Structure formats: structure tokens, C-alpha cells
Amino acid sequence: GRGLTQCRSEGPGEIHFITHSLGGILLRYYLSENTISELGRVVMLGPPNQGSEIVDGLLTLPGFGFIGGPAGVALGTGEGSIINSLGPVEFDLGIIAGSTNINPLEFLFITGPSDSIVSIESTKVRGMNAHMVLPVTHTFMMRNNEVIEQAIHYLKTGSFILESIDEEVDD
């Protein structure tokens, strides 16, 4: 509401978004229910676009449903997950995933390389225009100079700076 109103008051033009983690899911949910006619490009940093494998692991612990509540349970990777009910994106989206793990217990919950919180695979979503992997952690990726440079470049051009794209993405 207020943020969009303020953007619109700045004058005509596109409204771009950079989100981090669950912020990307909130934007996807908002756009599934609303239209932003001035929507430009979106860059998501470490979004759990296919749900959270950590939530799946925590669901097995007694009391998680009570502590995490229905919202916590709905963030998993299962069929009942709100995240997985959102479907493909229909806007210009670039995603940056991290590949640096500093979580010694990650192996208990996450399959494959991750940023310590979200697996690289889980960041992907059907309809995305670009995906890249950088050697950053989930918690601090938004403060990383290369992430910032890549995000700004994507908002301006609709593509990431190709020299930095991880080879995993080219498969």
C-alpha cells in the first residue's frame, strides 16, 4: 500500500523490486492477488521458491507446529505448502542464489549445495528469466558488493553480468 503509493508519487515510471528470502514469497503472493501496472523487474535474493527444506525437517520435531504455527507449517516443500500453490511467475524475474554454507547442521535438512538456509535448487521457479549462483551466505548476501552490482545490472538491463554466472547454472 504505502510503499507503492510513495513510488507512484515520485513520478511516472516502472517500479522495480529487490527482495530477500521470504520477501520474494510475499511479493509472489501479493502479485498473485493484485496487479501493479507499473511493475518493472524483480530480483530475488535467496528465495525459498519451492518451500523450505529446513521447515520440512523441523516438522518432525515435537512442538514445531505449536511454535511455528500454521504459517510455519505452510512454508514447507509439501503439496499443502502455500509457496508451491503460487505456480509459475509471470513477471521479469532474476534470482541470485548463494552457495556458501556456514551451517554445520545443514546436512540434516538440506539436500545439495545451499547458502546455509535455502538450497540452490529451491530458489528456482518456473517462469524466471535468469538465475545465478554466487559464493555468499543467506544472511549476508544482500550486503555483498557483487550481489548488489548484479542486482542493479539486472534491474537496468534484464540480465546478469555473464562473467560471474556459476557454471552450475549453464546445465
Question: Where would I find each of the regions flagged by the language model?
Answer:
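Serine-dependent carboxylesterase/thioesterase catalytic core
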Residues: 1-90, 107-110
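C-terminal catalytic-base region of ester-bond hydrolases, centering on the histidine
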Residues: 88-171
